Design a protein with these regions (language model features):
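C-terminal motif of bacterial Sec signal peptides marking the signal peptidase cleavage site
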Residues: 16-19
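Bacterial signal peptide processing site
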Residues: 21-24
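Post-signal peptide N-terminal segment of mature Sec-exported envelope proteins
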Residues: 29-55
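Early exported N-terminus immediately downstream of N-terminal targeting peptides
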Residues: 63-101
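A mature extracytoplasmic/lumenal domain signature
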Residues: 88-92, 123-125, 131, 138-143, ...
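Surface-exposed, gly/pro-biased binding rims or lids
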Residues: 157-198
Length: 216
């Protein structure tokens, strides 16, 4: 009887052991939905409530001249001070046409989205033979089919195009080109030129340049 009992106990133990080993380890999920056992998992941003500020659909961006100045400053100790900086938000087409779904010819445009687009000059520069003193300015435009009027305005720290035209500082007329490679997002960058740098403004298939000359 004792031998039979031992065999039964051994059989039950073996069954239990095999049952435990056959169970797959379940992934550990924390309260936030992140799989701790999967390093490639991520939390979908739209599922995370943000009590402080939501992510804007038109991201804010910054362009320097020299290009990538903050990186140069951190890697090259002898990097001189920047000449200028542009801060703007980048709207995108989302299946719409630039003209006339988003913009209208002859109507002012903030050259971005949300806060007014701002350009900062760290030293005096020249634009179309006009001296622009160092300082902060709002940058906006009035687009036409063949040319854009670019305006510098001193009414800084404002939203959208609530611009006080009495504070317009300078106006510049620059030609535009069409049928360029199409860009989904508004893009504004500085590009080196013979006498300084051009501010390139490009969106959809439209592109224009504002030539900026440096004063030695």
């Amino acid at each position: 009887m004792l031998t039979i009992a031992r065999r039964i106990l051994s059989f039950l133990f073996l069954i239990t052991l095999l049952s435990c080993n056959s169970k797959k380890e379940q992934p550990v999920i924390n309260d936030s939905g992140l799989n701790k056992n999967d390093p490639t998992s991520f939390i979908s941003p739209e599922n995370i409530p943000n009590p402080y500020a939501g992510v804007d659909i038109s991201p804010m961006d910054m362009s320097y001249y020299p290009v990538d100045y903050p990186i140069l400053k951190m890697t090259v100790s002898s990097t001189p001070s920047p000449v200028m900086r542009l801060i703007y938000s980048r709207p995108h087409l989302q299946g719409r046409t630039l003209f006339l779904d988003l913009l209208k010819y002859g109507q002012p445009w903030r050259l971005g989205a949300n806060e007014a687009t701002e350009i900062d000059f760290y030293s005096d520069v020249t634009i179309q033979e006009k001296i622009i003193p160092a300082g902060r300015y709002i940058l906006y435009c009035i687009p036409q089919e063949k040319k854009w009027d670019i305006i510098l305005n001193t009414n800084i720290d404002t939203w959208g195009l609530k611009t006080d035209s009495t504070k317009d500082f300078q106006h510049f007329s620059i030609p535009v080109s069409h049928n360029n490679p199409k860009l989904e997002y508004l893009t504004m960058v500085f590009e080196k030129s013979k006498k300084g740098a051009d501010l390139i403004i490009a969106w959809s298939d439209v592109m224009t340049r504002l030539p900026i000359e440096f004063i030695p």
